[in-house]
């Protein structure tokens, strides 16, 4: 069971809060000898696996770290180009960690705006008057759950398909937003949420939900 991401989108479609959990289960690390038996390529400023799927490493996975050093896009933390490593035998043996490409801040903003538009389209296309819009989208690897308040704020949770009690969790997040963001005298409505107590209570609620597998009343 796992909760992958939490997004809060304002009524204009702007992303005002996001939290991500990068699960080690979705990552694979392996030590390679020369020559590297994977084909890596640069795509959208990320180094991805193009060929050589094996041992939990999938085509489309991104290089996340080399020899324990985090990779940011196409560069390591010390400024070296990732694609320079495979062709130099002096760099071997080399330990590489792979995983799903992580979204950039701009991509998250774009996806929030896109979901806001799809939500509105879904509401308009519904044959029922007063449609609530998109409440859940399901894939083979995750479910997207959405709860929209009367004021148009959307709370979105991406979770493992087997995770139970997400509807209750969404309403708990709304309570936390009301208590620790809206009641904060320094918070401006519709603006990005930067409140320490909101962060702390949200993380606590997510931990409880993950451990229990459900999030019932009174939690």
Swiss-Prot record:
It comes from the Eukaryota. PANTHER family: TRAFFICKING PROTEIN PARTICLE COMPLEX SUBUNIT, TRAFFICKING PROTEIN PARTICLE COMPLEX SUBUNIT 4. It comes from Rattus norvegicus (Rat). Core component of the TRAPP complexes which has a function of guanine nucleotide exchange factor activity for Rab1 GTPase. Plays a role in vesicular transport from endoplasmic reticulum to Golgi and autophagy. May play a role in dendrite postsynaptic membrane trafficking. Component of the multisubunit TRAPP (transport protein particle) complex, which includes at least TRAPPC2, TRAPPC2L, TRAPPC3, TRAPPC3L, TRAPPC4, TRAPPC5, TRAPPC8, TRAPPC9, TRAPPC10, TRAPPC11 and TRAPPC12. Interacts with SDC2. SMART domains: Sybindin. GO terms for biological process: autophagy; dendrite development; endoplasmic reticulum to Golgi vesicle-mediated transport. This is Trafficking protein particle complex subunit 4. The keyword Disulfide bond does not apply. Belongs to the TRAPP small subunits family. TRAPPC4 subfamily. InterPro entries: Longin-like_dom_sf, TRAPPC. The gene is Trappc4. One of its GO terms (cellular component) is postsynaptic density membrane. Keywords: Cell membrane, Endoplasmic reticulum, ER-Golgi transport, Golgi apparatus, Membrane, Postsynaptic cell membrane, Synapse, Transport.
């Amino acid at each position: 069971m796992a909760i992958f991401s939490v997004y809060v989108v304002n009524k204009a479609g702007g992303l005002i809060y996001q939290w991500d959990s990068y699960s080690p289960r979705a990552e694979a690390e392996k030590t390679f000898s020369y020559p590297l038996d994977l084909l890596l390529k640069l795509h959208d400023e990320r180094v991805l696996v193009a060929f050589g799927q094996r041992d939990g490493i999938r085509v489309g996975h991104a290089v996340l770290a080399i020899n324990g050093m985090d990779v940011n896009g196409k560069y390591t933390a010390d400024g070296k180009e990732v694609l320079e490593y495979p062709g130099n035998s002096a760099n071997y043996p080399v330990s590489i960690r792979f995983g799903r490409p992580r979204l950039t801040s701009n991509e998250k903003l774009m996806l929030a705006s896109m979901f806001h538009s799809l939500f509105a389209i879904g509401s308009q296309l519904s044959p029922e008057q007063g449609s609530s819009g998109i409440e859940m989208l399901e894939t083979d690897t995750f479910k997207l759950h959405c709860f929209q308040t009367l004021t148009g704020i959307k709370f979105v949770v991406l979770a493992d398909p087997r995770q139970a009690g997400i509807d209750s969790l969404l309403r708990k997040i709304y309570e936390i937003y009301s208590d620790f963001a809206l009641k904060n005298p320094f918070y401006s409505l519709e603006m990005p949420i930067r409140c320490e107590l909101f962060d702390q209570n949200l993380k606590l609620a997510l931990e409880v939900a993950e451990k229990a597998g459900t999030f019932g009343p009174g939690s």
